[in-house]
């Protein structure tokens, strides 16, 4: 398991609400909580930038973090991430913020401390461009957008 430096920016974390933790041995994501000043209603079509009260520093350029939606919120209530996926670079040190979007038809109450997203660490491979005049042939070539077949 990798060590991840974290700073608690909201004193309610560690007191009223636990630090992010893996729910099971097989969990890939750490739950992030809505550290709002008060419960907030997210109206249909509305987006809101929600503080998590936590900052992290990954430090290792071979890693990054992704902020991903919690499946139950999207499926049951239409609450998804406004930017679909949040990418946290290894050298970022600011507060983790979650953009929530209500794509549903009804208002949704976000309670203080509610688990709203999850943080997943992923490996990163940095590449450089090697400029060429032509590519070696591949089976697919430049075909895209359904080129490989139908359902």
From Swiss-Prot:
Names of required cofactors: Mg(2+)
Top-rank taxon, per record: Bacteria
Binding site for substrate: 70-72, 83, 87-89, 97
EC number: 3.6.1.23
SUPFAM superfamilies (alphabetical): dUTPase-like
Annotated family: Belongs to the dUTPase family.
PANTHER family documented for this protein: DEOXYURIDINE 5'-TRIPHOSPHATE NUCLEOTIDOHYDROLASE
Function: This enzyme is involved in nucleotide metabolism: it produces dUMP, the immediate precursor of thymidine nucleotides and it decreases the intracellular concentration of dUTP so that uracil cannot be incorporated into DNA.
Name this protein carries in UniProt: Deoxyuridine 5'-triphosphate nucleotidohydrolase
């Amino acid at each position: 398991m990798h060590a991840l430096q974290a700073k608690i920016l909201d004193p309610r974390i560690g007191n009223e609400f636990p630090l992010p933790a893996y729910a099971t041995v097989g969990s890939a994501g750490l739950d992030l909580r809505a550290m709002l000043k008060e419960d907030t209603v997210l109206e249909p079509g509305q987006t809101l930038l929600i503080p998590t009260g936590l900052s992290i520093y990954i430090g290792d350029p071979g890693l990054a973090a992704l902020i991903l939606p919690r499946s139950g919120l999207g499926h049951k209530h239409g609450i998804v991430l406004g930017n679909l996926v949040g990418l946290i670079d290894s050298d970022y040190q600011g507060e983790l913020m979650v953009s929530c979007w209500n794509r549903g038809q009804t208002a949704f109450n976000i309670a203080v401390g509610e688990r709203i997203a999850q943080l997943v660490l992923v490996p990163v491979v940095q590449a450089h461009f090697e400029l060429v005049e032509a590519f070696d042939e591949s089976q697919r070539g430049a075909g895209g957008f359904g080129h490989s077949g139908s359902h």
